[in-house]
Every structure is written in C-alpha cells, then in structure tokens.
UniProtKB/Swiss-Prot annotation:
Region (Essential for interaction with PTPRD) location: 69-85
PANTHER family from the UniProt entry: INTERLEUKIN-1 RECEPTOR ACCESSORY PROTEIN (PTHR11890:SF20), INTERLEUKIN-1 RECEPTOR FAMILY MEMBER (PTHR11890)
Disulfide bonding pattern of the chain: C24-C122, C47-C114, C137-C181, C160-C212, C266-C332
Protein name: Interleukin-1 receptor accessory protein
Domain TIR: 403-546
Any one GO cellular component localisation term in the record: plasma membrane
Sugar attachment sites: N57, N107, N111, N118, N196, N209, N299
CDD domains: Ig1_IL1R_like (cd20992), Ig2_IL-1RAP_like (cd20993), Ig3_IL1RAP (cd20931)
EC id: 3.2.2.6
Signal peptide location: 1-20
Membrane spanning stretches: 368-388
Domain notes: The TIR domain mediates NAD(+) hydrolase (NADase) activity. Self-association of TIR domains is required for NADase activity.
Record field: catalytic activity: NAD(+) + H2O = ADP-D-ribose + nicotinamide + H(+)
Amino acid sequence: MTLLWCVVSLYFYGILQSDASERCDDWGLDTMRQIQVFEDEPARIKCPLFEHFLKFNYSTAHSAGLTLIWYWTRQDRDLEEPINFRLPENRISKEKDVLWFRPTLLNDTGNYTCMLRNTTYCSKVAFPLEVVQKDSCFNSPMKLPVHKLYIEYGIQRITCPNVDGYFPSSVKPTITWYMGCYKIQNFNNVIPEGMNLSFLIAFISNNGNYTCVVTYPENGRTFHLTRTLTVKVVGSPKNAVPPVIHSPNDHVVYEKEPGEELLIPCTVYFSFLMDSRNEVWWTIDGKKPDDIPIDVTINESISHSRTEDETRTQILSIKKVTSEDLKRSYVCHARSAKGEVAKAATVKQKVPAPRYTVELACGFGATVLLVVILIVVYHVYWLEMVLFYRAHFGTDETILDGKEYDIYVSYARNAEEEEFVLLTLRGVLENEFGYKLCIFDRDSLPGGIVTDETLSFIQKSRRLLVVLSPNYVLQGTQALLELKAGLENMASQGNINVILVQYKAVKETKVKELKRAKTVLTVIKWKGEKSKYPQGRFWKQLQVAMPVKKSPRRSSSDEQGLSYSSLKNV
C-alpha cells in the first residue's frame, strides 16, 4: 500500500511539475531563512511565501482555490520528492501553512519547498532546514539570538523565544532555566518566572548563554523545546552622552613640510545607544573628500568596550602634501542619536629651523675635547693640584690644636728600618718639607716607662706614620703597641690620622688591627730608587696625607741632618 502511494504521488507530482515548469514563479532558495532545530524536538515551520513574498495570507489563497503543496530535497541530493505525511504517529504533518515535525530526526535535514498553485497560477520558495544535535551544556552550532540588557538599570527580563503555537493556552508547560551548564536557582540577582527570566540588576558578570527548556504534554506524549539565547550587558541610556571627539584636539598641531605624508586621526567615542546609527566623516574646506581634487585616503577602524561603547577612528591620509593642502580646513564630524559634534584639526606648514650643523658640530667637538683634556690633566696631575690648593687656600691645621709634633713615626726596631726612618724619611720631611717628626728612640728621655711615653707622644702628634715591613707585624713589639694606640685614638677621638707607608711587602698577617687598617686606609708604597726624589709621586702622596702647615719650608741643607743631596748615597 505504501509503495502504491509513493508511485501515485510521484506520478501526479511529475504531472504538476511538467504543467507548471514554464509558468511557476520560483523565488529560489531563501538562505536568509535558514531554520535550525534540535534533534528529537518538535518543530513548526510556516511557509515563507505568506510572510515575505506574497501580499495575501493563506486563508485568502485557500478561498481563491489555491492549494499549498510541500516537498523536499534531502541533504547532499538533487532530486526533489514529496513529503511523506503518513509516517507513524503523524511525525510529519501539515496544518494550513505550517509544516509540523513531532519530533525531528537528523535525517530530516534538507531543503524544503512550499508551492502555492492552481491551474493558472503557481508560486514557490525553498528554505533550508538543519537538524542539529545538542550536548549536556546545550552547546550547538546554532546561531544564537542576542538579547541586550542595560547595565545597572533596574529590573529587566528576557523571554523564552520561539515557543508560540506549539501548545494551546490551556496547557501549562514546565520551564527550566539554565546559565551555561548550571540550573538557575538561588541566584542573587536572576530569578526564573515561568517563560520569563528576571534580572533584578544587570552586571557584566551576567553576560553569557541562557537556555530555557519547555516541557509540555500532547496526545499522551511529552515533548521538550530547547531555546538558547545570548545575554549581553551594555551601557545604560542614563549614562549616554553625545559623541566625544578625542582627536583632533587643541593640544596637537600637525606640522608638515611640502612633500611629506599628512596623517590626521579622528578618534570618536560613542556611548552605547540601542539602534543608534553612529557616523564619523571628514570634510575638507567644507566639502566631502571625494569632491576635492587631491589624493585623499581614509581608513576606519572600530573597537568596542565590554559594555558595547564604541570607539571609531578614521585616519585621513595625504601621501605627498602640498603647501596648498596645508592651508586647507580639515574638520572631523561625528553623529549619533544623542547629537552631532565637529572638531577642526590644526594643520600648518613647518618652518625649517636654521641649520647650524657645522657650528654645532665644532662646538660639541671642542667641548668634548676640553672635557677629555681636563680629565686627563686631573688624572695625571691631581696630586699637584691638591698640593697647590693646600699651599694657597688650605687652612693651617697646626694653629691652636695643642699638638707638639706633626708626625709620630712607628717602625720596626732593626738596622734597615731605622736607617730608612732616620736618614730618608726624617731627612726629607724635616729638612725639605719642614715637618716636625717625633721618633721615639731619638726624642724619648732615658729611664721613662715605654708604654706611657709612647701613648704620650702619640697624643701630642697630628699624624701616626706607620712604616710597614715584615718585621713590623711580629707580636709583642713596641711597633704594634704604637699601631694599636693610634688606631684606637683615631676611632674614638678622631684627633689623629694614621698614614701607612709600605717599606717592604708584608705577607698575609694575623694582626687584626693591621688588617683593618689596610682595608680602610690608603697604603703609600716605597719603590726604592724611584721614590728617593723629593718631588716624586711617593713624596707628593705623603704630603697630601700630612697636616696643612703655612710655615715656610726649611731650605738649608745642613740644618738638623741630611738634605736631599745626601740621599743619593743612602
């Protein structure tokens, strides 16, 4: 029986096709009306002819003797075939201009055609139907409708979409709402109210996909309708302002020379306004850029904030600007539902600055050369410069300081060190430079207590000059007593300075006072024959460490011992 019905249907369908093939108004495939439905859910689809293409409705067409015929083309096939309305439980049926699926299956995907005709008139249109699967989180490739809520605007609602006509008003369905995968219950500001979902106050955190699942009975069966929509929280109209032009502005001047590229950005902020048309455009001398005989390019970019506030940037570009172009008026305009604003860019020709390239180069080179010379001179002659300053501008340290000696000399008591101290150091410091030295073995009185006299001499001296040698660091010597006393005096009272002169190299020592002194004090090294000349570096370093004295130096070569002329034989 079923086979016979198919054969008869195909026969009559072929006749209809052949009769109407030449005179049927075919509106083609309406891709703008792509219908997507979930598998195993009901679907009702109205013939698009009465919604978009014809000026009369189904009742008028039926009264005029027109018949509505349905057929379809399976997915990935070209052959059109009639729809089987004799499936078990009337899974596919037609009611007036509506095609019903109770429920849909995956293999229902295809292009469906509704044709309205009689013996003299024919009109048809096709539309695609896609049956898709859904997962546990209601994810699918469906294109979701977007519902916009105003941020912090008060109570707002969304309604479960596309459920009208599936069940009579006498049926009370069960509606469950989800946000993503989570059932909405006990949310702080979102309350399900049947077909509606109320937002007491909308925040950015409410952005997301919301799904309503409508469950209703029909003829002893239970059907489910799943509808998902995207909620986007946008700026409130209470906070909307007219367009704001950030650039051009009064703080930026576009200075160019003829032949350079001129780039002027027009950046405009638009508050979100529902259904507002935001526009940005340039005028040059009050005209559109297309009406000006210059090569102008305008590029636009658009960005949005989280609340759909919009920033538009139009960059006006002239590749090679002329002097005439730099005299023109460039004005950026912006318009929205809140109003219209305009701002002119400040454009002018750059005045070339005077070029003093050679003069600047010579001046800079001379300055650098002078600095280098001064650095070299200071590095080489810094001792002489310090001594010159001390001699002419230094303050005499010996006035009213209560000291008797300039220098107390501490050294190891053996023949070599004694010869160095008594002949070399004393000869130059006293005879050439005029300093008064205290040498214990020379200036102490017989019969005194060594410790007391040593401390007394150190107290009366302005400097403690320590002659370092391997013999100096031997434990229990008078030299170490002098070193300790001088360092303690320098640390506690600060009225004596310690000078370290290395007569001979000293290996690693266990004397902690000497270790500490060598860490914090500069060591002046005696280099034998190289250091004997009184105007040499050794004696200049020593002079810098000595106290400043204004008294004239002794020039007599035979006063109190040997002069420098006798040092050559030492």
